């Protein structure tokens, strides 16, 4: 059960807010606040799932970032070199003049994979990142 509501302020780019407003309208939320609460719950759930990544895993990190952000491309390369023992392959796609999409295929210890993903997520200029893994011994 949730406790009393707290009022907060958030600064967002116009384009992000416009897209969010479209989604909350399509989903039938009664207000932006309800949409934001739902988004935060989803983020918390994903973060808790990430905390449970243990054992041998295979997976991907998908990243969209602004390559014009000073030092970002080098920081991404440094992280990938640091965790090169986990990386099996990567694909780099130029989305437009400023934005790149990268998919990194991983195989190794779940804790280290999580560390790599969190290091990328923390970089300024990363617009989107998503870690997806599966235990390598799961039967499909």
UniProtKB/Swiss-Prot annotation:
Cofactor stoichiometry and binding remark: Binds 1 nickel ion per subunit.
InterPro entries: Acetolactate_synth/TF_NikR_C, ACT-like_dom_sf, Arc_rbn_hlx_hlx, CopG, CopG/NikR_regulator, Ni_resp_reg_NikR, Ribbon_hlx_hlx, TF_NikR_Ni-bd_C
Gene Ontology process terms (BP): regulation of DNA-templated transcription; response to nickel cation
Keywords, in A-Z order: DNA-binding, Metal-binding, Nickel, Transcription, Transcription regulation
SUPFAM superfamilies named among the record's database cross-references: ACT-like, Ribbon-helix-helix
The protein's required cofactors: Ni(2+)
Coiled coil: none
Single GO MF annotation: DNA-binding transcription factor activity
Binding site for Ni(2+): 81, 92, 94, 100
Pfam families: NikR_C (PF08753), RHH_1 (PF01402)
The family this protein is said to belong to: Belongs to the transcriptional regulatory CopG/NikR family.
Function of the molecule: Transcriptional regulator.
Protein name as catalogued: Putative nickel-responsive regulator 3
Organism per entry: Methanosarcina acetivorans (strain ATCC 35395 / DSM 2834 / JCM 12185 / C2A)
UniProt lineage: Archaea, Methanobacteriati, Methanobacteriota, Stenosarchaea group, Methanomicrobia
């Amino acid at each position: 059960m949730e406790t009393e509501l707290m009022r907060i302020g958030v600064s967002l780019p116009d384009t992000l807010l416009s897209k969010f407003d479209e989604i909350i309208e399509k989903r039938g939320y009664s207000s932006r606040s309800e949409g934001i609460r739902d988004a935060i719950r989803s983020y918390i759930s994903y973060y808790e799932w990430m905390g449970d990544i243990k054992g041998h895993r295979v997976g991907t990190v998908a990243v969209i970032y602004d390559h014009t952000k000073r030092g970002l491309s080098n920081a991404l390369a440094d992280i990938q070199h640091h965790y090169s023992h986990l990386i099996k392959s990567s694909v780099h796609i130029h989305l437009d003049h400023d934005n790149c999409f990268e998919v990194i295929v991983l195989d190794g210890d779940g804790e280290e994979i999580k560390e790599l993903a969190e290091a990328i997520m923390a970089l300024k200029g990363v617009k989107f990142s998503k870690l997806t893994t599966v235990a390598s011994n799961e039967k499909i």
